[in-house]
């Protein structure tokens, strides 16, 4: 007796089974194509973010130097291994990474069709390159705790990107941004969010 899909092309295999698997194959083929297209568009946005990051880094270096403040801690870099960017503005570290784009993924609760495949660029408060290298076994959890916003990039250029920012009260606020403006708007908003705030002294509990 044969079990499973042994002899799938055998004449005994029903046409119904083949039709069902054909639907699955077509679905996966469509997802794969959309995944490739979304990543292609996202890679272009990612490269443009780095180009704008270098321009802004020069601006901040000049601005602080003109005020007599050392600018050694103002720089940016790209890491191809982790698919990440890092921008340092004095004591603030801002990261962008595409490391999670390893398979086709839809966007939950998207205003668009649930079938739409998106690529994702995650923005972090803190050095995402260091976090990725030091936490290979708990990568998703670590980056999730550092995330301040994510840009979701669709597979079709006619569709807008969706920018989701995480506010201090942990509410997610989605905003639609055109693909043409996504790189600059995403970078500026993240810098405003991270550097426009600050840090709080930790406090001990005294008895």
Write out the residue ranges for each language-model feature:
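Compositionally biased, low-structure terminal segments
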Residues: 4-6, 30, 97, 101
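Beta-rich nucleic-acid/ligand-interaction surfaces
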Residues: 70-86
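Contiguous, amphipathic alpha-helical segments that mediate oligomerization or scaffolding
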Residues: 15-75
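Intrinsic disorder/low-complexity polar-acidic segments
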Residues: 82-207
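Charged, low-complexity intrinsically disordered tails and linkers
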Residues: 1-22
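Intrinsically disordered, low-complexity segments enriched in small/polar residues
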Residues: 2-5, 66, 93, 196
